[in-house]
Swiss-Prot record:
Predominant location: mitochondrion
Domain of life: Eukaryota
UniProt keyword annotations, A-Z: Mitochondrion
Gene Ontology, cellular component aspect: mitochondrion
Entry annotated with the keyword Mitochondrion: yes
Lineage: Eukaryota, Viridiplantae, Streptophyta, Embryophyta, Tracheophyta
Species name: Arabidopsis thaliana (Mouse-ear cress)
This protein's name: Uncharacterized mitochondrial protein AtMg00630
Length: 110
């Protein structure tokens, strides 16, 4: 069954859902308290791992880091996750990243 399309939500909601799911896959030893208290540093620490294993995931994590820290993304036009992820269900009700006009996260969603 396809995942629902996420409505526009504040980053605090994403920290509790999307970010938690993504972080738990990559670094299961990180607790939710650590995530809530140090979102930016945790995401930044994952950058090297993600850059080497999955550049599209690294882009998503870095964007989450910027949002979580309250910083503006320097140039959102360069964040083209949807083009790099090459997912297969862009049109079948997958999970979408609400800050980037329909970027699909189905490949890495739980």
């Amino acid at each position: 069954m396809p995942s629902p399309i996420l409505p526009m939500l504040p980053i605090s909601h994403l920290i509790g859902t999307e970010v938690r799911n993504l972080i738990s896959v990559r670094t299961p030893n990180i607790t939710m308290d650590q995530l809530k208290n140090g979102c930016c540093s945790i995401l930044t620490q994952l950058e090297t791992l993600l850059r080497s294993q999955s550049p599209s995931e690294m882009t998503i994590f870095q964007t989450l880091c910027d949002r979580c820290c309250g910083a503006e993304v320097a140039n959102e036009a360069t964040v083209e996750c949807g083009k790099t992820m090459e997912t297969t269900n862009l049109t079948s009700g997958g999970r979408y990243w609400p800050f980037h006009n329909g970027t699909n996260l189905s490949r890495i969603s739980l």
